[in-house]
Amino acid sequence: MTENPVSDRLSTAAEKASVLIEALPWLQRFHGATVVVKYGGNAMIDDELKTAFAQDMVFLRLAGLHPVVVHGGGPQITAMLERLGMQGEFRGGLRVTTPETMDVVRMVLFGQVGRELVGLINQHGPHAVGMSGEDAGLFTARRRTATVDGEAVDVGLVGDVVSVNPDAVLDLIRAGRIPVVSTIAPDPDGVVHNVNADTAAGALAEALGAEKLVVLTDVEGLYTDWPDRSSLVTRLDADELEALLPGLASGMVPKMEACLRAVRGGVPRAHVIDGRLAHSVLLEVFTSAGVGTMVLPAGTGEK
C-alpha cells in the first residue's frame, strides 16, 4: 500500500484541531476564573513532570485563566535535613518541627522549591512571582497538635491556617502574574509555623472566591476502599465526602479536607487528580472527561 505523506499530515492536523475545539466550551466557561492548584507529590520531584506542570500554569494564564499555585515540599525538606545531619521525626503523620527544623523548612520551601518552580514558569516569560504565607499577612497560623493513640502530642511549630488575607495575591492576579505560594505562616505573635499545603490551598481558594481548587496527588483520585481499584470515586458532593472522611487513608485526609473546606466555603468545585500524569491539570480543566475525583457542593453529587 502506497503511503501518502500529505494525507497523513492532514489527518494528524485534523486530530490536533479536534483537541483544540474540545477545549472551546471550557475556555469560554473559565475565562477570567481563578484556579488554585496545590502542587505536590511526584509532580514536584520528577523533572519531566515539573516541566509539564510549569507549562500547564503558563497555558492556563495565556488562555485567560488566573492560576495560583500553593506548594509544600516534604521530600525536599527531609533530604535537606539528612544532608545537614539533622534528625527528622514524625508523630501522628506530622513532622516534629523544632525552631532549628523550622529554619530548614523555611529555607527549603521558599528558597528552593518555590524558586525552582518560579524559574520553570518564567522560562516562558515573566509570569510567576514567589511569595510565602508570611508576606503581606497572607496566612495566619495557629499551633496544633498531633493525635497518637488517641492522645494529643506536641509536634512543635506546626500550625493550621486560621485566617487568610488575600489582598497581595489579588494584586498579583490583577497584574497578570502567577502567584507561587510557599506554605509557611506566622501565628498572631509572629512565630512562624510549618502549615499543611493541602489545607492552606483550600483556605486560599475559599478566600479568593476561586472557581476551582485542584489538588495534585500520587493516585488516580479518591478511593473509598484503598487499595481496591474498583472503589475509585469520580464525583461526590460535600455531604458524601464528609461521611467518608473518618475511613479514608491518612495521606488522603488533608487533601479531601481541603476540598471539603473549599466547596463549603463557596468554591463551586474541587478536584483531586493524578499528578503522575503529565499535563493532568490541562486535562482536568479543558476536557469533557476530566480526570480524578470532583467534589461539589452538597446536593449536587451522584446519588
UniProtKB/Swiss-Prot annotation:
It comes from the Bacteria. It is an enzyme of class 2 (transferase). The record marks K38, K255 as: Transition state stabilizer. Its EC number is 2.7.2.8. It is found in: Cytoplasm. InterPro entries: AceGlu_kinase-like_sf, AcgluKinase_fam, ArgB, Asp/Glu/Uridylate_kinase, Glu/AcGlu_kinase, NAGK-C. It catalyses: N-acetyl-L-glutamate + ATP = N-acetyl-L-glutamyl 5-phosphate + ADP. Keywords: Amino-acid biosynthesis, Arginine biosynthesis, ATP-binding, Cytoplasm, Kinase, Nucleotide-binding, Transferase. One of its GO terms (molecular function) is ATP binding. SUPFAM superfamilies: Carbamate kinase-like (SSF53633). Substrate binds at G73, G74, R95, N194. The keyword Disulfide bond does not apply. One of its GO terms (cellular component) is cytoplasm. GO terms for biological process: arginine biosynthetic process via ornithine; L-arginine biosynthetic process. Pathway: Amino-acid biosynthesis; L-arginine biosynthesis; N(2)-acetyl-L-ornithine from L-glutamate: step 2/4. Pfam families: AA_kinase (PF00696). Catalyzes the ATP-dependent phosphorylation of N-acetyl-L-glutamate. Belongs to the acetylglutamate kinase family. ArgB subfamily. This is Acetylglutamate kinase. It comes from Saccharopolyspora erythraea (strain ATCC 11635 / DSM 40517 / JCM 4748 / NBRC 13426 / NCIMB 8594 / NRRL 2338).
